[in-house]
Amino acid sequence: MKKSRFRRIVYILCVTAICFIPCCLKGIWMGSDAPFHLARIESLNQALQMGIFPVKVHPSLAYSYGYGVGIFYPDFFIYLPAVLRMAGCSLEVSCKIYIFILLLELFVSMYFCVRKKTGEIYPALAAGTLYLFSYPVIDGIFKSFTLAQTQALVFLPLALMGMVLFVEKDEFPWMLGIGFTGLIYSHALSTAIALVLCFVLLVFQLPKWIGKKKKWFYLMTAVAGVSGITVSYWGPMLE
């Protein structure tokens, strides 16, 4: 059992390392969104050094007039590269460490979802591998550099699979809650897309739910929990 688990961990790390190979080249590829996201990370680092936390307005942006990018674009996950910058890493190294962790998260997320649904190890490993080398991931990291959108891809499978499992079973939808919490703190548009997909799934199952008060209670509790956890993002945005 332990040997099998060790092999799985080694496999996941090896596949992630293979996908990470383009990052071993010197420099940062300048995709369409690269200037924006690099500026977010660097300005977040500068704001933290000024003692500002949490950072909603990045003071060094917009010719040092400040720009409220953190109000509409969640900064939660780019605190990691920003803190690495504070620790003395270059912007390039900070971004590449973040990207490696992001690739690992993408694999583990899809692996976990498929394993949870099927109970099988090898299909889950295959799904994780295919997901890591899928066009949205490769394009988001190595071409367009849409880091926030790619970060959301970590939580999209959790949200959708969480909804599927919640429809099928009378269990608390913790996967659904984690998925939407991560989506909200990653990318607002991806959250909206996931909401639409989950709503469609809910509508088709509605006739089966009418008399199930426990299921509605679980769903409302999950919605309230996610809303409370993510209020630091959507509260200032709505204001």
Question: Language-model segments: which ranges?
Answer:
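Membrane-embedded transmembrane-helix bundle of lipid-linked glycan/lipid transferases
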Residues: 1-239
